[in-house]
Amino acid sequence: MKAVILAGGLGTRLSEETSSRPKPMVEVGGKPILWHIMKMYSSHGINDFIICCGYKGYVIKEYFANYFLHQSDVTFCMKENRMEVHEERAEPWTVTLVDTGDDSMTGGRLARVADHIKDEEAFCFTYGDGVGDMDITATIEFHKQHGKQATLTATYPPGRFGALDIDNGRVNNFKEKPKGDGAMINGGFFVLSPKVLERISGDDCVWEQEPLIGLAEDSELMAFEHQGFWQPMDTLRDKVHLEKLWSKGQAPWKMWT
């Protein structure tokens, strides 16, 4: 199965960190948060990634092009124009980086990678700025069992995200960003059928609006309830919080060894 990760946004609320790099390349524990998200998926056996690039996408391309320089010790033989990598730390990943435009919205970015996912039975989809101890394997199995077009992970963070009305796993209503009312919210980890691509109207389409609302209205959106840790990195305060968890060895999203 493939995982599509949105990595093209400006990250305006993290402007201190994103003036020279896209938000998913902001580091936690010396590694881009994008790396942490990919490690989460990889710990569940998902190693084929489609990265939706946009703002300063070349930074992401350069990171993967020089991955071993970031991860390993190296020796440069200047005379022979040769580089030797020591203790090469490879990941079992296939990474496809797609330029989805500087100004495309979330739905538009997903539509722009359609050629890479249209023949899949299902695929994972998430944002490049949130981590958690989600049971991705169980979410995929839940999606296969109910047979609907879309599954999202529902969780309980602060009330500034899209609230869900859930009945026996089925999402009856999707409301974007209400003021906190204690409802479960969209945690941003999806399993989707390629049929959802038909609901995206173009580059200006916001995934969290017409497509998700329409899926809920058509009884095609299901929720896998997550009771554990989830944290988006929207602000500098969020970044500091994640850094503290990582530095103390208390990062719940670190499900790999």
Where do the model's predicted regions map?
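Well-ordered alpha-helical segments embedded in enzymatic catalytic cores
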Residues: H36, R109-R112, P211
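Short conserved AdoMet
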Residues: S19, I46, A65, K118-D119, ...
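N-terminal glycine-rich phosphate-binding loop and ensuing alpha1 helix
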Residues: M1-Y67, L97
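Conserved beta-loop-beta/alpha segment of the NTase-like Rossmann-fold superfamily
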Residues: E62-N168
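Catalytic-core segments of class I nucleotidyltransferases/pyrophosphorylases
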Residues: E121-T126, V131, I136-K144, T155-F161, ...
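Structural beta-sheet core signal
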Residues: I5, I51, F125, A150-T153, ...
